A protein has these predicted regions:
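Conserved NTP-donor binding/palm subdomain of two-metal-ion nucleotidyltransferases/polymerases, i.e.
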Residues: 1-118, 124-405
Length: 405
C-alpha cells in the first residue's frame, strides 16, 4: 500500500470517528498496515468503535485491535487515578496546579478514554516549584532523570506513571517564541488565578481557562514541529477548536494574543489544514478561510516527512534532526550563539561542575555537533543533506511566520 493511500485512509477514518463524516473506503485495505501506522501515530483507539459498528475488520485484526484498545483504556484509568492522587496531594499542601495537555486535551474528544495518554504534565507557579517537587519526593515519587535534565520541568515516576512538574513550557524555556517568552509566561501565571475544574466521567481535575489551555495546545504543536509531530498533537488542537474556537471567540479572545506573539498565521494555516484533511467543520469557524491551501498542503507534507507524524527515529536521524533544529530556528548570530551556549552547559558535565568552564560551553557544543556530523556514514553528503533540509524548513517557517524575532 502506498504511503499516500495509507495516509488518506487514516485521515478518512479520523474524519468519520471524530465528526461522523460519511466516507467510502477502498475494498483492498491492508488493515494491518493501517493499524500499525495508527499505533505509531498514537491514534489507534479513535476509529476502533466506528470500525466495529460497521463490521469492516476480519476476526484476527479485530481481536488484535481490541487488545490494543483494552490496554489503552486500562492505562487511561490507571493514569487518571494517579492524577487524582497527585491533585489531592497538591491541594492538601495549598499548591495551585493545572493539568497540561493530557486530560486537559481529552475533554474535547467524543470518547476521552480513547485518546492515547502519555505522562501527567502539570504546571505550578515557579515560586512553588521547589516546594511541590520536594513534597513529591517525600510522598514516594522518584526522579526519572537528573533534576537539571531540562530547564523547565522535572520528571518523576510513581506506580509506573511518569509525572512532569513544570514551571514553564519547553518552547518558552528555549525562547522559540519570537522573544515573547516573558509575555507568555505572564499569561500562563495569570491563568493560575482563574483555574477551571473539568470533569471526565468521575474524574475531576484543574485546567487553565480556555485562552491559556488553547495556547498551550498550539505551542505544543509548534514545539514538536521540527523533531517530529504526531497526529495526536494536531488532533488535540483540532478538537479544541471544534469545541471552543468559533469566529466570535477567535476575534475577541485569541486573535489579539496570537497576533502579538506572531502565531496568528500558523494557527490559521493549521486550522484550515484540519478542515481540508481531517474533517473539522467549516460552519462558524471561518476565521481560517483566508489560508493559502497550497501552504496548508506544504505543512501537511512536512508533518508526513518528519518521521511519519513522529515515527521513532534512529539515533543518527535524531542527531541530524537536532542539527537541523539549530539551523532552522536560530537564524541570527546571537540566537545561534545562545543556543550553542545553552546546549553546551546542558551537555557538558564538567561545565555543570566547574563554573569557570561555563563561558566556553558554546565551543564544547560546536565540537559536539561537528563530531556528530563527522561520525556518520558519508559525513560530507550527510552534512550537505542536513543543510538542504534546514533550508527547506527555514523557507516553510518563513512562510508560516514562525521563529521570527
Amino acid at each position: 500500500m502506498l504511503n499516500a493511500d495509507k495516509n488518506r485512509i487514516i485521515f478518512d477514518l479520523l474524519r468519520a470517528a471524530l465528526f461522523q463524516k460519511d466516507i467510502a473506503l477502498p475494498n483492498n485495505v491492508d488493515w494491518n498496515q493501517i493499524l500499525q501506522e495508527m499505533k505509531i501515530q498514537t491514534v489507534a483507539g479513535l476509529p476502533y468503535e466506528w470500525l466495529c459498528n460497521r463490521n469492516i475488520l476480519d476476526t484476527k485484526i479485530k481481536m488484535y485491535w481490541n487488545q490494543i484498545v483494552v490496554f489503552q483504556v486500562s492505562f487511561w484509568v490507571k493514569l487518571m487515578r494517579e492524577q487524582e492522587l497527585l491533585i489531592q496531594l497538591m491541594r492538601k499542601n495549598n499548591i495551585n496546579m493545572v493539568i497540561l495537555k493530557g486530560s486537559a486535551a481529552a475533554i474535547y474528544y467524543p470518547r476521552p478514554d480513547l485518546r492515547t495518554m502519555g505522562d501527567v504534565d502539570f504546571f505550578v507557579h515557579p515560586q512553588n516549584f521547589q516546594k511541590a517537587y520536594h513534597i513529591l519526593l517525600k510522598n514516594g515519587y522518584q526522579l526519572a532523570y537528573p533534576e537539571d535534565h531540562a530547564p523547565h520541568h522535572i520528571t518523576l515516576r510513581k506506580n509506573n506513571i511518569v509525572f512532569e512538574i513544570h514551571k514553564t513550557l519547553s518552547i518558552i524555556a528555549t525562547n522559540n517564541v519570537g522573544n515573547n517568552e516573558d509575555y507568555l509566561q505572564t499569561l500562563l501565571l495569570k491563568g493560575l488565578s482563574s483555574i477551571e475544574q473539568k470533569k471526565i466521567e468521575n474524574w475531576e481535575f484543574p485546567t487553565f481557562p480556555r485562552l491559556q489551555n488553547g495556547i498551550v495546545l498550539l505551542l505544543h504543536v509548534i514545539q514538536h514541529l521540527i523533531s517530529g509531530l504526531g497526529l495526536r498533537q494536531i488532533i488535540d488542537w483540532m478538537m479544541f477548536v471544534n469545541s471552543e474556537l468559533n469566529d466570535e471567540t477567535w476575534r475577541l479572545e485569541f486573535q489579539p494574543i496570537l497576533r502579538k506573539i506572531k502565531l496568528e498565521k500558523f494557527a490559521i494555516i493549521l486550522t484550515r489544514m484540519c478542515q481540508l484533511h481531517l474533517g473539522l467543520r467549516i460552519e462558524d469557524i471561518t476565521w481560517c478561510h483566508s489560508a493559502d491551501s497550497l501552504l496548508c498542503n506544504k505543512l501537511l507534507d512536512h508533518f508526513m516527512e518528519k518521521g511519519n507524524f513522529g515515527r521513532k527515529l534512529r539515533r543518527k536521524s535524531i542527531q541530524s534532526g537536532q542539527i537541523i533544529y539549530i539551523l532552522s530556528t536560530n537564524r541570527t548570530p546571537l540566537k545561534f550563539f545562545k543556543r550553542l551556549q545553552d546546549s553546551g552547559i546542558h551537555n557538558w558535565k564538567l561545565a555543570k561542575k566547574y563554573s569557570i568552564l561555563r563561558p566556553f560551553a558554546w565551543i564544547y557544543q560546536a565540537f559536539r555537533y561537528t563530531w556528530q556530523g563527522l561520525n556518520r556514514k558519508h559525513p560530507v553528503q550527510s552534512i550537505l543533506s542536513d543543510w538542504e533540509k534546514s533550508k527547506k524548513q527555514v523557507d516553510l517557517f518563513d512562510e508560516l511566520k514562525l521563529f521570527d524575532e
